[in-house]
């Protein structure tokens, strides 16, 4: 699958896709309902491939790898460490897979890579003088830590009977609808907090940490200042105001925790084999890092 069929390189060697950057059809005006419906059910589209994948991972995380809700009624270091370990393994496997294939193995070299250069490994602007080490440190020590704090405290609050819990046998339709709406809520929440943290004082205080990555890699996705992580993972608080199921929290946090990896991969497409590649739709956000 040759790069030239999908884009071209400028005189500095930067890859520019032919595909135009655009908003999803559900976010355009005037409304385009037919286009929106086609996008929702197309591949790639609203549900596939990414969002149903994150829903599936979140459901497995709750129903198979998490203790029952009543176990969260008492806050303790053991519960927190279990949650932190579970989330760390998810991040290590998912982000690590992108990083290993694209940046360690360099399985497709710079084919479809926006910036022909590789991450900076000798710069004082990053912790430890390395972009990759800086990003991994912030991902786990701030990102996964704060993600796990939100998870443990919200589930503790729910276990104390402070929310209206649903019964799956009686509310399966509501349960499924809420899961399918998570991506919409995440997009809206991210848009709002992202506009907020680009307010100059907050940008200088917190968001500039993330934007040091002008040539991002997968680990850049969750490499943020702790203040930004608090804003970012606050998306899970919404479900305290609706009939509640713990899976809503886990799926939302998994979506927030994992989805930045492909969006910051630094490539337009990933080659599956010599003749097949798939679009990871990351060019718009790459331009945001490059120019803002």
Describe each PLM feature range.
Residues 1-192, 196, 205, 213-233:
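Non-catalytic, topology-defining segments of multipass membrane proteins
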Residues 189-217, 267-268, 279-292:
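Acidic (Asp/Glu-rich) catalytic motifs at the cytosolic membrane interface
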Residues 223, 229-292:
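C-terminal transmembrane module of eukaryotic multi-pass membrane proteins
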